[in-house]
Amino acid sequence: MGLSQEELKKINELKNTARFQHSWKAIRNILTWKERVQNYFVRNMFLLLFCFLGGSSLMLLTDEGILPRSEFIDALMMLLVRLGIFFLALHIFSVLLYNLIGPGWEAKQKAKLRKLYESDILAPILQALYPSSEIDMEHDIAPNQVKEVVPKSQYYIQSGILELNDERNLQTVDLYAYNVEKGNKGYYDVTHFLGQVYSIKNTFSLKGELRIVPTEHFLLFENQGYYPGTMQDGKKIDVEDIQHNEHYNIYCTNEQSTRKFLTPTVIEWFNSMTSRHKLSFYSNESRIYFADCNNQSFFAAPQHKKSLQAWRIEETAIQLKYAFYFANEVTEMLHKNEGFS
C-alpha cells in the first residue's frame, strides 16, 4: 500500500510548515535530554580532572625546579585547586539532584512526548489523509470492552483514539497489554498483545454477545493463550468448517444470531486471515470490536534517538492508511454477509 501523488504532496507540504518543524524539534529535545545530561556529567568530570591534574603538574614541576616559583605560578595553582573543588561540589550536587528529580522528570517527559507527537505530528498527518478525522487524547476506548477482545493482562496501555467521524463511528487505538513478572534479575514485562484495536457501531442484526478468538495447536493440544473464553450466560460453539474450528474458538450468548452471522462468506474471510493476522472479534448489541495482534505500534512516537532518526513521515502516513484499510476490509466483510446486514 502506498500514497497517491496528491497525498504525498499534502504531507510534504505539512512537513515543511513552521509548526511541524517546531514540534519535531521539541520531540528531538525530549528524546535527547538524557544524552545531554550525560554529556554534562562527562564535561564536569573532564574539567574536574583537568583542574586537579593541572594543579598537581604545576606543583610537581615547581618542586623539581623545572618551573621557577613565582606569584603567577602560585596564583595559577590556587585557581586550579579552587576550580577543582568547585567542579567536585557541582558534580556531587548534580548527581544528587538528578537522582532526586530524574525519575519523575523522565515520566513527565514521556507523557509530554506522547501528547506532543499525537497532537502536533500524528493528527496533522491523519487530517491530511482524512480531513474529517481527529485524535482524542483525553479518553480511551472503554477498557472493559477492550478486555473482551484481547488477552487477559495486568496492564493495558492505549494510544489516543483515532476517529474518522464517519457513519460507522470508527475508532482505533494502539494497544499494549502486558504482565509484570519477577525473575532472577528483577522484574520484567511479559507482552500479551501488541497491535491495534478497532471499534465500530453495531448496525447489523447481530444479537447478544459474540467472541471469536484465535487458537494455536501443538500436537493434539489446543491453546488460545490468555484470550477470554465463555462469557456469562454464553457457550462455546463449533461450525461445519474444519479449518475455522482449528484456528478459532467461538463463544456466544445467542447461538441463533451467531450462526446466522457465521455464513460461509464470513468463515472464509476469517480463514483467510490466519496467515496474515492474529485476529480476534467481539460484539455486543451496541458496538463491534476487533483486534489485530501484529506486534507493531502504528501510532506511537519514536522512543529513542535511533528511532527518531529512522522516522519517516511517508511511512507513518502509510501505516495510518493501512490501519483504516484493514478496518474497511472488516466492515466490507460484514456488509457482504448476504442476508445478515
Language model region names:
Residues G65-H91:
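Hydrophobic alpha-helical transmembrane segments
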Residues A123, Q127-P131, I135-Y178, Y187-S341:
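Charged, low-complexity intrinsically disordered regions
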Residues K182-N184:
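Flexible, membrane-facing loop/turn or short amphipathic-helix motifs
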Residues M1-F41:
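Cytosolic juxtamembrane N-terminal segments of multi-pass membrane proteins
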Residues I30-N44, F87, W105, Q109:
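Amphipathic coiled-coil alpha-helices
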Residues Q38-E64, A89, F93:
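Canonical alpha-helical transmembrane segments of integral membrane proteins
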Residues G65, I92-I121:
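Transmembrane-cytosolic junction motif
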